A protein has these predicted regions:
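Active-site neighborhoods and metal-handling regions in enzymes and metal-associated proteins
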Residues: 1-398
C-alpha cells in the first residue's frame, strides 16, 4: 500500500506534466515536508529534493541525514549523499544530468522542444538558485508554487483532523483565560502570553504556532503587537491571538498543523461611556465576522469573503480602521494561500482552510479582532473554533 507521501509525489508529477516542466527542486521547508514527511530547517548545506516529471525522486543531502532519509516511507526515493569535504555541486550536477532530458523525445523533455524548465522552491535561497543555474545552464527556471500551491491548498482528511484538534486546544485555552476574569488585572501582557503558551502545551499542543499576542488597552490598536510589560488594568479590552502546532497522524512521517484563534475580551467593568463604545465596535466586528463566514461556499471567490466582512465595517463608518485582509490560508504554514483579500478571484473549493479575522483598530484607544479558522465544505463552511466570541469574562462564561 502506498504511503500518503508517495501519493503526493505522484500528484506532483502529474502537475509537472500539466505545466510542461521537467522537474521540481525543493529545499527544507513546507513543500519538502508535504511531499516526503522530512522536516528540517534550512541551512547553508545543500539539501535538495528533485522530483522529475518522469522517473523516481532523488534527494541530495549531507551524509549526516542518511539515517533519517532512508527511513522515509517512499520506496522509490533515491538518496545521494555528500560529505563535508566534498563539493555538493558535483553531486547536484550529476543528478541533474541524469534527470533532465538530453533532447527532444527524451522522457520529461519539453513538448515544444524548448529548454527544460526547472521549478525551484519559492523559499530557495538565491545562492542555491544560482548554483542550480550553474549546474544546468541550458534550463529555464520558474517557481514550484505553480504545482505545489494547487496540491497543498486543499487539505485531506488527515490534515483536517490535525487542524480540528488544534482548534479544540485553542478553544480550551480561550475558555480557561476567560474564566479568570479580573484575576488577569495586574498581570503583564508578557506574563499572560507565557501562561497561554503553557496552557496550549498542557492541553496537548506542541510549539506555539506563532508569537502569542496579548494586546491590552491602546496596544490592541496594533494588529501584530508584541506582548510587553504593560500591566492589564480593570476595564481593559484585550486582544488575544494564539495557537499551537499539532502533529498530523501520518504513517512514518511528520507534518505539523497550527491553531490560530483571536478573541477580544474586556476584564472587569469599564466606565459606562467607554464600555458602550467598546461594545458597539465589538458588535460591528462580530457582524463582519458572521457575514464573512456566511459568504464561504464552493464557487465563491476569496475576494467575496473579504468584501462581505469589509462592507459591514465600512457601512458602520470604520472602513479606514480595518487595515488588513480578512484572512489567510492555514496548513503546514500559518500563512499560506488562499489569501482572503478583496482582489483575489481564486474560487473556493472544498477542503480549503483559512482564517476569517476582521478587525477595527482605533489608534491610541483600543482594537477589536475576532478570528476563527474555517474549512470550505460541500455546501458552506465548518468552523474549527467554537469558543465564545463575545466580550464576557468570568467563571460563568460558556
Amino acid at each position: 500500500m502506498r504511503s500518503p507521501f508517495e501519493r503526493r509525489l505522484e500528484a506532483c508529477q502529474r502537475r509537472l506534466e500539466r505545466v510542461d516542466a521537467a522537474l521540481a527542486a525543493l529545499v527544507p521547508g513546507p513543500n519538502l515536508t508535504y511531499l516526503t514527511g522530512f522536516e528540517e530547517s534550512p541551512s547553508e548545506r545543500h539539501l535538495l529534493l528533485f522530483v522529475p516529471r518522469v522517473g523516481d525522486p532523488v534527494v541530495v543531502a549531507p551524509a549526516m541525514y542518511d539515517a533519517q532519509l532512508r527511513t522515509l516511507p517512499i520506496e522509490t526515493l533515491a538518496v545521494r549523499l555528500w560529505d563535508d569535504d566534498d563539493d555538493p555541486l558535483e553531486e547536484i550536477e550529476a543528478v541533474l544530468a541524469e534527470l533532465l532530458p538530453a533532447g527532444d523525445g527524451d522522457p520529461g523533455s519539453s513538448r515544444d522542444g524548448d529548454a527544460p524548465t526547472i521549478l525551484v522552491d519559492d523559499r530557495m535561497w538565491a545562492t542555491f538558485t544560482q548554483d542550480l543555474r550553474a549546474c544546468a545552464p541550458a534550463a529555464t527556471f520558474d517557481l514550484a508554487s505553480r504545482v505545489l500551491e494547487d496540491l497543498r491548498i486543499r487539505k485531506d482528511d488527515v490534515e483536517l483532523e490535525a487542524l480540528r484538534r488544534a482548534g479544540e486546544i485553542a478553544d480550551r485555552v480561550s475558555l480557561e483565560i476567560r474564566s479568570r476574569g479580573t484575576e488577569l488585572v495586574g498581570r503583564t501582557e508578557a506574563e499572560l502570553a507565557s501562561e497561554i503558551e503553557r496552557l496550549l502545551a498542557e492541553y496537548g499542543g506542541g510549539d506555539p504556532a506563532f508569537e502569542t499576542i496579548v494586546a491590552s488597552g491602546p496596544n490592541g490598536a496594533r494588529p501584530h503587537h508584541h506582548s510587553g510589560d504593560r500591566e492589564i488594568e480593570r476595564g481593559d479590552p484585550i486582544v488575544l491571538d494564539f495557537g499551537a502546532f499539532v502533529d498530523a497522524d501520518l504513517e512514518d512521517g511528520t507534518g505539523r498543523y497550527p491553531g490560530d484563534q483571536t478573541r477580544t475580551i474586556v476584564v472587569g467593568d469599564a466606565p459606562g461611556d467607554e464600555y458602550d463604545r467598546y461594545e458597539r465596535v465589538h458588535e460591528v466586528v462580530r457582524e463582519a465576522h458572521r457575514a464573512a463566514v456566511e459568504a464561504v461556499e464552493p464557487g465563491a471567490t476569496a475576494g467575496a469573503v473579504d468584501r462581505a466582512a469589509r462592507s459591514v465595517i465600512e457601512d458602520a463608518g470604520y472602513g479606514d480602521e480595518f487595515v488588513h485582509r480578512t484572512g489567510h490560508g492555514v496548513g503546514l504554514e500559518v500563512h499560506e494561500p488562499p489569501y482572503i483579500v478583496a482582489d483575489n478571484d481564486r474560487k473556493l473549493e472544498p477542503g480549503m482552510v483559512f482564517s476569517v479575522e476582521p478587525g477595527i483598530y482605533l489608534e491610541g484607544e483600543f482594537g477589536v479582532r475576532i478570528e476563527d479558522l474555517v474549512v470550505v465544505t460541500e455546501d458552506g463552511a465548518e468552523r474549527l473554533n467554537e469558543s465564545p466570541r463575545g466580550w464576557e469574562t468570568g467563571s460563568g462564561v460558556q
